[in-house]
A protein has these predicted regions:
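Membrane-interfacial terminal anchoring regions of lipid-handling membrane enzymes
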Residues: 1-211
Length: 211
């Protein structure tokens, strides 16, 4: 534990917390005065959502299920829009794509079994990271994601160096291991875990995508 805490203090990254726009329990936006607004920007009284025809407030299974579904969609959209991408996510996504290309066949479980077997030239991975970073910057400019503070101003090599420090700080198992001019993909499961942050945006392998 002491070693882990000591590593955390040495990291140049940190815990990122991002707050999305507030919503009420029906998915309407809420201003600083607590007033709810519907999708057309009109002020609404949330009490009206649970008031029956007789003017009584009460539960309605079908109605409430629909409200729950709509609220879930709003929360999921907000989560996507407020996703903060860090160097670990970018490097892991690029490395996992290199793993898939190197193995060349099979499914997720086949790829994950190739731990410590695939080595990628560092320059090749850096180029893949930069290509992915270009797409991420386009997404960020469109307001669909947010890039972490330690992503700005870095190229592919810089992001790899930052990610390697973060991996070694958070995990006892090595994720990417330098070997000469190469990086060995050691912990394929952690690479998959980190790259998942980009999967919902269509920028990494999505294990849940419909075939």
């Amino acid at each position: 534990m002491a070693s882990f805490v000591d590593k955390l203090y040495g990291l140049d990254g940190g815990c990122v917390i991002r707050f999305g726009d507030p919503v009420d329990c029906f998915g309407n936006t809420v201003d600083e005065d607590g007033v709810s607004y519907d999708g057309r920007g009109r002020p609404v009284d949330p009490v009206g959502y649970v008031t029956g025809r007789g003017g009584k407030i009460g539960p309605d299974a079908g109605r409430d299920a629909e409200y729950t579904r709509e609220l879930g969609e709003v929360i999921c959209k907000s989560y996507l829009a407020n996703t903060v991408i860090l160097p670990t996510h970018i490097v892991a996504a690029a490395a996992f794509e290199e793993l898939r290309n190197a193995v060349g066949h099979g499914d997720l479980f086949v790829w994950l079994r190739h731990k410590d077997e695939v080595a990628i030239p560092r320059a090749q991975l850096a180029a893949s990271v930069e290509r992915l970073l270009g797409k991420l910057r386009e997404e960020a400019a469109a307001g669909r994601i947010h890039l972490g503070p330690n992503v700005a101003g870095k190229d592919g090599a810089g992001l790899i160096a930052t990610a390697l420090r973060a991996f070694s700080g958070y995990h006892t198992q090595e994720v990417l291991v330098p070997r000469g001019e190469d990086l060995v993909l050691r912990d394929t499961r952690l690479l998959f875990y980190y790259q998942n942050r980009l999967a919902a945006h269509g920028l990494a392998f999505d294990g849940l995508a419909k075939k």
